[in-house]
């Protein structure tokens, strides 16, 4: 928070602000723009005209609440009404009605949508901005070839190329190219107009031969030639109006529509003054582009950097929703046209309401949110995850790049990203560099560019002025960096400071500085700005830390970090997990479900979240932090949320850690923990699983929900009520029935075996007319039933069966196989849980909670964890919390080391713990082995870092298979836990078994347990009857499959006997 020159306060912008501003822009401008494009519709005889009056559209407040939409699997939407008129030209009568066009999904206050009960987010897309770009490439002979690429608003491309002989070509596709003169002639210019409006007419005339003159002799000839290259597959086309119209639709409208942004970029690059409302490519654009291309050939002009952010644009949620709304209106226009003509044909009297159907807009948006790659299910693991997901920017998607074809240069960090896109936070894997995260202070400008704020430094200004500069504009200023990033405005700057100018870093005098950054975290995303001492970490480890903080599970008893960065409060406030007072008043009632506040003669009901399931099965809740009768102010926190403490983000716990090896149990990033973390619920978390079953209407009748399930043991249905649904509050174990359901079926008597029919006749058991299809608790799941919902979707389109959902709350303690991590990319798997008495203990008798491997620090170069570890120990002894801004070396050298050692020294003096700081080995201490009581040979680094429990838990991953399905082709077990698949024995696993000489185990894994069909059947029979398992006598199915594939390549694999004799080689000693 900084004070500006006018006495006001400059705060960090809302982290959801970009999403909210985009949706508001769509509601205020996008709807009007698309509705104004709706054409007047007439019948065939042009007697009746239909039109929309776009000035009077209105959106109705949603009829349901957000929480009800989630539980009932509905869409949180608003109904759109527009005035429409039907004019009869003969009598000049107009019938005007307000019609319902459809439902529009509405964004909530967190920047998300609720579609069919699921929280979804529309992320921003970064694309190449429409316009013209010049670049140079080397051909096979090492000669530079200059090209100019015109990119349309929809991603279509038209390339202009100049070869070694200075001939200019227009490349329509990758293979076909035509002369630039043919293109200009097809656009309506004759040769004289072309030569009069270019700067180099002699170059264009130099390659004009008789054959070329014939092609451009008339517009018709040019269009025919252009059509041959562009669309004609075979034959000799003749000029016609349909051919001209087809070329106009296919090429000039699809590939040459620049749009508003493209027209602006074209005017700026080619120094044109064409009006911005003229959004199509004009002959004048081609002429100027050709002149510039020829100038580049002779050393004049500059090339473009395609990866510079000034050549990129952001396609926000407003653009995506507006495109879908325009698509829905086009479909509506066609539907109204067909309905109107049908009504006139059948001599019915149409009305505006009868002509318009509301399903088109609704289904268009349902398809967009369900299928579009930029519409994603909200990652709700913790509050931070929701914010980071909304601030992602992706180069993938329609019109963008793909993970397999994007080059390294596109993925790399560009200097123009400075202050706009975080250089650290990106995806790992194939999408690295293609999915980034926006910096904290960035905003989206009117032209789709990313703007970053700077302070203007001038002697004329008495105060501080903030400028938001788009990419490219800040390159013309000297931007101070490094030690000029002081938080205090009044600090005296040095005489010489590092600065950035034209993508280069310089050292200049302070008097030459034009701009300065406004905040130390200005260049990072919210995830990276939560890492203390980030300047001491390798960038790869900082990237891992940013991603792993999003995977942290909210704990039962959260704890705010001892060492932080100061951004924790902002992240918690903008995440929506806190309940904030909207006005001042007095609390008159509070419980776990709601808070009632009275003020200004009104009573406000603030509902609280209680055991709400996120999309990642984590438990979200809110706890009141105010008392009855307490007076509150506007903006005060009323209730804390999951993973928040005192209004700050709290994702983990500060535990006592030692960096030392321990009997090999922390080898290769494994982690050793104490049993007190389990018994004291230090890393215990709650998870909510949702189980769903549908009730269908079958051909034999409806399915029945009942508690009378035949052939099931009584203890499995003990928790069902009279309706056959599990009671809320019941404790369920694997195999218990949650919903009892019977499906009717027709079973013939002949379907049973003879002995079964005889037994039924003797005992008098009737043939069952239904089949048990109950919803049961799966293997490995247990917990408490916290909610049961019976959902019937009313209305809608198509068949909507009834659904019954059961929510089960699970309590998970930390166990062997769970994953934990710090905030510096240091992650590991729990390998062993030791008794408290066996853990190493300190000189004051406290046992260590967690043991990390010290070898994980030097090679990974994430030294920031050492600073956090030691400073956390000092903070726990002194009962202090630290908020450290990054790059504190701007104040003095070794600033981080000095503050850590000074705090440790103070802790050792004030708390009577001299072991906290020992001058011989500062930061380390002598600790004792809990098993023997002896001291370890070397001093060990101990401290209290902030440790997170990640969502990668062993309960979700452990899997076993006894029987299961096999693949049809290879006859091998399927892959994956969801399919009850088997464990793959690959090449390296076979080598390991061979190394130990376990021949029988290896044979079983490659034959009986895998794809030997006959041997599998023999093993089953032998197991039932008893006896020795026979050895397989023929080849397994995978070998037979290999033989068949070789035969498909005309290769026959055969075998033959060389000799029946045994050959022995006698080796003689040398």
From Swiss-Prot:
CDD domains: RNA_pol_B_RPB2. GO terms for molecular function: DNA binding; DNA-directed RNA polymerase activity; ribonucleoside binding. Signal peptide: none annotated. InterPro entries: DNA-dir_RNA_pol_bsu_ext_1_sf, DNA-dir_RNA_pol_su2, DNA-dir_RNAP_su2_dom, DNA-dir_RNAP_su2_hyb_sf, RNA_pol_bsu_bac, RNA_pol_bsu_CS, RNA_pol_bsu_protrusion, RNA_pol_Rpb2_2. It comes from the Eukaryota. GO terms for cellular component: DNA-directed RNA polymerase complex; mitochondrion; plastid. It catalyses: RNA(n) + a ribonucleoside 5'-triphosphate = RNA(n+1) + diphosphate. It is found in: Plastid. GO terms for biological process: DNA-templated transcription. PROSITE patterns: RNA_POL_BETA (PS01166). In plastids the minimal PEP RNA polymerase catalytic core is composed of four subunits: alpha, beta, beta', and beta''. When a (nuclear-encoded) sigma factor is associated with the core the holoenzyme is formed, which can initiate transcription. DNA-dependent RNA polymerase catalyzes the transcription of DNA into RNA using the four ribonucleoside triphosphates as substrates. This is DNA-directed RNA polymerase subunit beta. It comes from Cuscuta reflexa. The gene is rpoB.
């Amino acid at each position: 928070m900084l004070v500006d020159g006018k006495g006001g306060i400059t705060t960090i912008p809302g982290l959801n602000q970009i999403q909210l501003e985009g949706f508001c822009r769509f509601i205020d401008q996008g709807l009007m723009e698309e509705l104004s494009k709706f054409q007047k519709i007439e019948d065939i005889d042009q007697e009746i005209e239909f039109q929309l009056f776009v000035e009077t559209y209105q959106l109705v407040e949603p009829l349901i609440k957000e929480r009800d939409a989630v539980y009932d699997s509905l869409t949180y939407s608003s109904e759109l009404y527009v005035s429409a008129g039907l004019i009869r030209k003969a009598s000049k009568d107009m019938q005007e009605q307000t019609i319902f066009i459809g439902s529009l999904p509405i964004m909530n206050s967190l920047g998300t949508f609720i579609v069919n009960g699921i929280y979804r987010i529309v992320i921003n897309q970064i694309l190449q901005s429409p316009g013209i770009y010049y670049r140079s490439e080397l051909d096979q002979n090492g000669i530079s070839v200059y090209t100019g690429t015109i990119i349309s608003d929809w991603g279509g491309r038209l390339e202009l190329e100049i070869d070694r002989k200075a001939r200019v070509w227009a490349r329509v596709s990758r293979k076909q190219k035509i002369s630039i003169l043919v293109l200009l002639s097809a656009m309506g210019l004759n040769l004289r107009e072309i030569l009069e409006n270019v700067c180099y007419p002699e170059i264009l005339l130099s390659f004009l031969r008789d054959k070329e003159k014939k092609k451009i002799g008339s517009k018709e000839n040019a269009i025919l030639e252009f059509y041959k290259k562009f669309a004609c597959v075979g034959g000799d086309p003749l000029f016609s109006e349909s051919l001209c119209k087809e070329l106009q639709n296919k090429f000039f409208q699809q590939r040459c529509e620049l749009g508003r942004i493209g027209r602006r970029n074209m005017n700026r690059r080619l120094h044109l003054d064409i009006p911005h409302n003229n959004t199509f490519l004009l002959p004048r654009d081609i002429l100027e582009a050709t002149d510039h291309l020829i100038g580049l050939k002779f050393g004049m002009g500059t090339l473009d950097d395609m990866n510079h952010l000034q050549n990129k644009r952001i396609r926000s949620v407003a653009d995506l929703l507006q495109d879908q709304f325009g698509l829905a209106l086009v479909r509506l226009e066609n539907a109204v046209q067909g309905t109107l003509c049908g009504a006139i044909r059948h001599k019915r009297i149409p009305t505006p309401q009868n002509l318009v159907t509301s399903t088109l807009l609704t289904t268009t948006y349902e398809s967009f949110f369900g299928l579009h790659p930029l519409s994603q299910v909200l990652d709700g693991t913790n509050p931070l995850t929701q914010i980071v997901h909304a601030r992602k920017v992706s180069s993938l998607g329609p019109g963008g790049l793909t993970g397999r074809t994007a080059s390294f240069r596109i993925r790399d960090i560009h200097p123009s990203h400075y202050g706009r896109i975080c250089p650290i936070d990106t995806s790992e894997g194939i999408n690295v560099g293609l999915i980034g995260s926006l910096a904290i202070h960035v905003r989206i400008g009117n032209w789709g560019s990313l703007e970053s704020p700077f302070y203007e430094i001038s002697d004329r200004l008495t105060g501080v002025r903030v400028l938001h500069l788009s990419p490219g504009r800040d390159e013309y200023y000297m931007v101070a960096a490094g030690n000029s990033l002081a938080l205090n405005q009044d600090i005296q700057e040095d005489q010489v400071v590092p600065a950035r100018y034209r993508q280069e870093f310089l050292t200049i005098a302070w008097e030459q500085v034009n701009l300065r950054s406004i905040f130390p975290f200005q260049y990072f995303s919210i995830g990276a700005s939560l890492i203390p001492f980030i300047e001491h970490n390798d960038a790869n480890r900082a990237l891992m830390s940013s991603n792993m903080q999003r995977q942290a599970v909210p704990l039962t008893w959260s704890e705010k970090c001892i060492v932080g960065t100061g951004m924790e409060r902002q992240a918690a406030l903008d995440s929506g997990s806190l309940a904030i007072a909207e006005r001042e008043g007095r609390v008159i009632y509070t419980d776990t479900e709601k808070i009632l506040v009275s003020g200004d003669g009104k009573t406000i009901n603030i509902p609280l979240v209680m055991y709400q399931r996120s999309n990642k099965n984590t438990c979200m809740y809110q706890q009141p932090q105010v008392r009855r009768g307490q007076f509150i102010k506007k903006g005060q926190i009323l209730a804390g949320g999951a993973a928040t403490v005192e209004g700050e983000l709290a994702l983990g716990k500060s535990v006592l850690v030692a960096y030392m090896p321990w009997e090999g149990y922390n080898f290769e990033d494994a982690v050793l923990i104490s049993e007190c973390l389990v018994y004291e619920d230090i890393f215990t978390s709650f998870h909510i699983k949702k189980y769903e079953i549908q009730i269908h209407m079958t051909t034999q009748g409806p399915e029945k929900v009942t508690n009378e399930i035949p052939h099931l043991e009584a203890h499995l249905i003990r928790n069902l009520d009279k309706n056959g649904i599990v009671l809320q509050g019941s404790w369920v174990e694997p195999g218990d029935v949650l919903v009892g359901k019977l499906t009717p079926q027709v079973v013939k008597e002949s379907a049973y075996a003879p002995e079964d029919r005889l037994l039924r006749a003797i005992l008098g058991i009737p043939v069952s007319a239904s089949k048990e299809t109950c919803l049961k608790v799966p293997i490995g799941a247990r917990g408490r039933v916290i909610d049961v919902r019976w959902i019937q979707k009313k209305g809608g389109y198509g068949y909507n069966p009834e659904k019954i959902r059961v929510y089960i709350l699970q309590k998970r303690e930390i166990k062997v196989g769970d994953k934990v991590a710090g905030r510096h990319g240091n992650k590991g798997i729990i390998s062993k849980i030791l008794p408290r008495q066996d853990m190493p203990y300190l000189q004051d008798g406290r046992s260590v909670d967690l043991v990390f491997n010290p070898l994980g620090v030097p090679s990974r170069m994430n030294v920031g964890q050492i600073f956090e570890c030691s400073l956390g120990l000092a903070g726990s002894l002194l009962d202090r919390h630290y908020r450290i801004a990054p790059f504190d070396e701007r104040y003095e050298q070794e600033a981080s080391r000095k503050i850590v050692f000074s705090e440790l020294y103070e802790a050792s003096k004030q708390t009577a713990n001299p072991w906290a700081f020992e001058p011989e080995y500062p930061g380390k201490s002598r600790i004792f082995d809990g098993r023997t009581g002896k001291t370890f040979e070397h001093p060990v680094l101990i401290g209290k870092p902030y440790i997170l429990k990640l969502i990668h838990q062993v309960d979700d991953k452990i899997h076993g298979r006894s029987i299961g399905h096999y693949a049809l082709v290879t006859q091998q077990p399927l892959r994956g836990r969801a399919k009850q698949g088997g464990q793959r024995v690959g090449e390296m696993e076979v080598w390991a078994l061979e190394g130990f000489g376990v021949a029988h185990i290896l044979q079983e894994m490659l034959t009986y347990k895998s794809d030997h069909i006959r041997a599998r059947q023999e093993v089953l029979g032998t197991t039932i009857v008893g006896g020795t398992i026979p050895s397989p006598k023929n080849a397994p199915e995978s070998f037979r499959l290999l033989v068949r594939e070789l035969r498909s390549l005309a290769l026959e694999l055969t075998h033959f006997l060389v000799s029946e004799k045994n050959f022995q080689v006698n080796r003689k000693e040398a």
